[in-house]
Swiss-Prot record:
<protein>
    <recommendedName>
        <fullName>7-cyano-7-deazaguanine synthase</fullName>
        <ecNumber>6.3.4.20</ecNumber>
    </recommendedName>
</protein>
<keyword id="KW-0067">ATP-binding</keyword>
<dbReference type="Pfam" id="PF06508">
    <property type="entry name" value="QueC"/>
</dbReference>
<comment type="function">
    <text>Catalyzes the ATP-dependent conversion of 7-carboxy-7-deazaguanine (CDG) to 7-cyano-7-deazaguanine (preQ(0)).</text>
</comment>
<feature type="binding site">
    <location>
        <begin position="16"/>
        <end position="26"/>
    </location>
    <ligand>
        <name>ATP</name>
    </ligand>
</feature>
<feature type="binding site">
    <location>
        <position position="193"/>
    </location>
    <ligand>
        <name>Zn(2+)</name>
    </ligand>
</feature>
<feature type="binding site">
    <location>
        <position position="201"/>
    </location>
    <ligand>
        <name>Zn(2+)</name>
    </ligand>
</feature>
<dbReference type="InterPro" id="IPR014729">
    <property type="entry name" value="Rossmann-like_a/b/a_fold"/>
</dbReference>
<comment type="similarity">
    <text>Belongs to the QueC family.</text>
</comment>
<dbReference type="GO" id="GO:0008616">
    <property type="term" value="P:queuosine biosynthetic process"/>
</dbReference>
<dbReference type="InterPro" id="IPR018317">
    <property type="entry name" value="QueC"/>
</dbReference>
<keyword id="KW-0862">Zinc</keyword>
<dbReference type="GO" id="GO:0005524">
    <property type="term" value="F:ATP binding"/>
</dbReference>
<keyword id="KW-0671">Queuosine biosynthesis</keyword>
<keyword id="KW-0479">Metal-binding</keyword>
<dbReference type="GO" id="GO:0008270">
    <property type="term" value="F:zinc ion binding"/>
</dbReference>
<dbReference type="GO" id="GO:0016879">
    <property type="term" value="F:ligase activity, forming carbon-nitrogen bonds"/>
</dbReference>
Length: 235
């Protein structure tokens, strides 16, 4: 991978789960900041499947990135949802998926900010996205912007929360991984499945969105390649 660092000696903390989105963000951060200027924070919040943490640990080690595991499992004692129990995945009467964990991204950003300030780091990167909106209110840009202001005021520190995937579709996120030279890496090593199935169950909302985006991107890529071949033949 060709490493450059347009950010000078600045460093970044990536909120990292081992999934497609956060791994793509981590790879982009390594490119943009340099591998020695990137750290990952991973949260143990009581998620129902250990495979998420295992994947995150393996990827961080493989990429040579320092990873810090933060235990926020206390949240499991004060809220319930399908991400932290064996409940069947469904939506409520308002269309909110029961995979939504109340306060999770707010909590993650708070702890990531506390950690970042302790390391003298201002840039925090998270892979939230509102384009393929899952119904999660804490994935919206308005929330991230407000949280950035709140954290700056709360700690008297100039955090810069970056959301490189905010306005990308899932297909565009796959495209970004490909541009980073890591399409196969993300396909093979990341975990997205809500049911904790190695390689994905293929039926949960997360797997369906991931596969739909991948198929869309590969179809677009194939069309571009065919067009390029035809153009070359005509030249």
């Amino acid at each position: 991978m060709n490493i450059s660092n347009p950010n000078g000696n600045r460093k970044a903390v990536v909120i990292f789960s081992g999934g497609q989105d956060s791994t793509t963000c981590l790879l982009q951060a390594i490119r943009d900041y340099g591998p020695n200027n990137v750290e990952a924070v991973t949260f143990q919040y009581g998620q129902r499947h250990a495979i998420e943490l295992q994947k995150a640990q393996w990827i961080a080690q493989d990429l040579g990135v320092k990873q810090t595991l933060i235990d926020t499992s206390v949240i499991k004692t004060i809220t319930t949802n399908a991400m932290m129990s064996d409940a069947q995945i469904k939506q409520d009467e308002n269309g909110m998926p029961n995979t939504f964990v109340d306060g999770r991204n707010a909590l993650f950003l708070l702890y990531a900010a506390i950690y970042a300030k302790g390391q003298g780091i201002t840039d925090i990167i998270t892979g939230v996205c509102e384009t393929d909106f899952s119904g999660y209110p804490d994935c919206r840009n308005v929330f991230i912007k407000s949280m950035n202001v709140t954290l700056n005021l709360a700690m008297d520190y100039q955090f810069n929360i970056r959301t490189p995937l905010m306005y990308l579709t899932k297909a565009q996120t796959w495209q970004l991984a490909d541009e980073l030279g890591a399409l196969d890496y993300v396909r093979q090593y990341t975990h997205t499945c809500y049911l904790g199935v190695e390689g994905g169950c293929g039926t949960c909302p997360s797997c369906l969105l991931r596969e739909k985006g991948l198929k869309q991107y590969l179809a677009q890529k194939s069309a571009v390649e065919k067009s390029s071949v035809l153009t070359a033949k005509e030249a």
